[in-house]
């Protein structure tokens, strides 16, 4: 799993836990829905830390809480 895939999965997981849709998350986070949906698109590779921070603010969690899960602990090495 790539970092981008892990971020997407974590966003979906957090939305499910809080019973909110991606569109709602975008609105409460102050980002456009298209930004959130593009982060979910498997074809897109880049993820902005600033956008992740805004989404965390909308979810009322810290970046540490967001990244503190098994998804990120088991990522493969990015440098080949």
Show the residue positions of the predicted features.
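Short, charged recognition helix plus adjacent turn
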Residues: 38, 67-80
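Short, basic-rich loop-to-helix N-cap that marks the start of a DNA-contacting helix
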Residues: 43-54
């Amino acid at each position: 799993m790539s970092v981008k895939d892990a971020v997407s999965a974590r966003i979906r997981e957090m939305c499910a836990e809080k019973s909110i849709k991606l569109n709602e998350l975008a609105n409460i986070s102050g980002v456009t829905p298209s930004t959130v949906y593009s982060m979910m698109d498997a074809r897109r590779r880049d993820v902005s830390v600033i956008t992740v921070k805004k989404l965390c603010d909308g979810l009322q969690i810290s970046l540490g809480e967001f990244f503190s899960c098994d998804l990120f602990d088991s990522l493969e090495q990015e440098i080949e």
